[in-house]
């Protein structure tokens, strides 16, 4: 279950109902998908082959199709980041630049952890700390950035409005 940390006051929201309510009020789509159907050989595997990535997409194809039909998404892929990722530190520096997009930024966490820092409607930032099974859609034009948690590894399905993917506006 995702958790929220509000930057300015350094408070946390950990209760499932309160997390969902907070995100809904901020216009952030949050869903919990069944991660238990992921086979053992893909669980916590951060060195994925193209075949592994295709298998992950097939496993969650119904969920991807459902959210895509509801929200108009047209493309998806799988990304894996870990200590074995070339230039991981450089990538993270780039990811941590505050930006927005003219479309939603959608991620489903398959393994590992990630954090979206999002500017709230009140202009203050909050973190959404994500774990396996969490799907988040950062709304279009919301200022945000993405980073990893202390384990510095994540496998995520990215879902896009267009086949070109997201274009960051800094």
Swiss-Prot record:
Organism (species): Bacillus cereus (strain ATCC 14579 / DSM 31 / CCUG 7414 / JCM 2152 / NBRC 15305 / NCIMB 9373 / NCTC 2599 / NRRL B-3711)
Protein family (similarity comment): Belongs to the acireductone dioxygenase (ARD) family.
GO molecular function, one term: iron ion binding
GO process annotations (BP): L-methionine salvage from methylthioadenosine; L-methionine salvage from S-adenosylmethionine; methionine metabolic process
Protein's pathway: Amino-acid biosynthesis; L-methionine biosynthesis via salvage pathway; L-methionine from S-methyl-5-thio-alpha-D-ribose 1-phosphate: step 5/6
Name by which UniProt lists this protein: Acireductone dioxygenase
Catalytic activity field: 1,2-dihydroxy-5-(methylsulfanyl)pent-1-en-3-one + O2 = 3-(methylsulfanyl)propanoate + CO + formate + 2 H(+); 1,2-dihydroxy-5-(methylsulfanyl)pent-1-en-3-one + O2 = 4-methylsulfanyl-2-oxobutanoate + formate + 2 H(+)
Binding, Fe(2+): 99, 101, 105, 144
